[in-house]
Amino acid sequence: VALLVIAACQLMVVLDITIVNIALPHIQRSLDFSTTSLSWVVNAYTLTFGGLLLLGGRAGDILGRRRVFVFGVLLFVLASLLGGLAQNAGQLLAARALQGMGGAIASPTSLALISTTFREGPERNRAFGVFAAVSAGGGAIGLLAGGVLVEWLNWRWVLFVNIPIGILIALATPRWIKESERHPGRFDITGALLSTVGMVLLVYGFIRAAQDGWRDALTLVSFGAAVVGLTAFVLVERRSRQPITPLHMFADRNRAGTYGIMLCLAAAMFGMFFFLTLFVQNVLDFSPLQAGLAFLPVSAVIAIGAGLASRFLPVYGPKPFMVVGGILAAVGLAWLTLTDVHSTYAGSVLGPMLVFSLGMGMEFVSLTLMALSNVPVRETGAASGLLNATQQVGGSLGLSILVTMFGTANGNEAEKQIPRFLRQATPVERERFQRTGELPPPWSDEVLTAGVSAAFIMAAIFAVLAALIAVVAIQVRPSDLQRLQGGAGPGPG
C-alpha cells in the first residue's frame, strides 16, 4: 500500500507535464492565448518544478519527509483546483507555477521515502523499479488521459482530475508511511530563487523575442537580467556551505557531459511533444482522444530502446548508446520537418516519431547510469535530483528557443499567405480577417506548418549537439561499468 501511495504521487506529478499538451488548442481558444505565449502553460510548471526540485529534497531531509510529502501533495491539489477554475491566462499560469512548486516538494521526497520505507535488497529494488516505470510511462499516460478528458468533458478536467487523486494520497500517507528522521541543515533559499528567477527571465526573453523581435527593449532587459541572476546564482553556490546545486558534481567530466546531454535532449523532447500536438490537432484535424492515442507508440518504443541499452550496456558501455541515441533522435526530428498540409499520420508522422523514441529510450538508461557514476551513496539523491532538474530546465529553455524559431517562421509565412488569401477570399472572409487578424484554413494551416517545421529543425540541432557532447565528453569503457555501478546505490535523496 505504501508503494501504491508513493507511485500514485509520482504518476500525478509526471502526468501533469504532458496532460495539458493535448488540451493546448482548447486552452488557447478558451483563454485567448497567442500561439507563442501558449508555451508558458508548459513552462510555468516545468520551470518552478525544475528550479525548486533540489530545495524540495532538502526540505524533506530537514523537516521530515512524510510531512513535506503531504504538504507538497496538498499544494498540488490546491493549485489544480485554482487552475481548473481559471478565467484568464494569468490565473492559469499562476496556478501552473504553483503546481510546479507542489510537484518539486512532493516528487524528490517520494523517491527518498522508498529508501526509508522498504528494506534494502529485492524489496527496495522492486519499489525503485515500479517508481522508474511510473516515471517513464507517465508522459504517455498523460497524453492519453488528456485526450479522454478533453474529448468527454473539457480542458479544465485535465487539472481537476488531480484533486481526488491528491486527496486520497494525503489521507493514506499518515496511515501507511512512517515519518523519517530529521537531519539538521540549512535551506539554500537564495540559490533556489536566483536559479528559478534567472531561468524564468531567460525563457521570457526568448518568447518575447518571438513576439516583438530581438531589438525590443524588454527582450534585451530580460536577457540582461537573466545573465545577472544566473551569474549571482553561481557565485552564491560557490560560497554556500550547503548549496542547493553541488557544483563539485560538474567536476567529473563524464557527469558534466551527462548533464549537458540531458539539457539538449530535454529541449528536443519537450519541443517534439508540444509542436506535434499542435500539428496533429490543428492541421490533421485529430480529436483530442485521437491525438492522445497517436502518441501511445512513443512509450512502447522508448521501452524497447531502454531494453536494448540495458541488455548491451555491459558489452559496449554507455557511450555508443548515447551517441547513437542522439543521432536517431536527430534523424526523427529532421524527418518531421518534411511534414506539410497534405501529410498524413501514418505516412509522415508515425515513422519519424518512432525513430525519435527509439533514440530517446537508449539515451535515458545510459544517462541515468552516468549521472550516478562515482557518486558517494550520501550524494546519490543530489546527483539524481540534479539530473531531473536539468531535464525540466532544459525542456523549458529549449521550448522557449523553439517557440522563437516557430514565431519567426510563422510571421514570414503569414506575409506570403495573406496576399494569396485576400485575392481568393469572399467579402465576408475579408471582413472577418480585418476584424480578427486570423487567417482561415487552409492558409492558417500553411502558416502553422511552416512554424512547426522550423521548430523541428532547431530540435534536431539540439539532438545533434547531444550526440556531439557524448562523442567529446563521455570516456567510459565497458570494463569501467562495475566500478561505476558500485557507487550508485539508491541513496536517501
Cite the ranges covered by each PLM segment:
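Transmembrane-helix bundle of Major Facilitator Superfamily
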Residues: 1-175, 316, 327, 334-337, ...
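A membrane-interface helix-boundary motif in multi-pass transporters
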Residues: 151-160, 208-219, 287, 408-461
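Transmembrane core module of solute transporters
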Residues: 3-49, 154, 190-191, 204, ...
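C-terminal membrane-cytosol helix-exit motif in multi-pass small-molecule transporters
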Residues: 163-180, 196-207, 226-240, 466-476
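Intrinsic disorder in cytosolic terminal tails and internal cytosolic loops
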Residues: 440-445, 473-493
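Short, Lys/Arg-enriched, Gly/Pro-containing loop segments at transmembrane-helix junctions
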Residues: 182-186, 242-248, 412-417, 478-488
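C-terminal module of multi-pass small-molecule transporters
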Residues: 63-73, 86-90, 94, 106-110, ...
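Interfacial helix-cap and linker-helix signal at transmembrane-aqueous boundaries
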Residues: 27-28, 59-60, 148-153, 206, ...
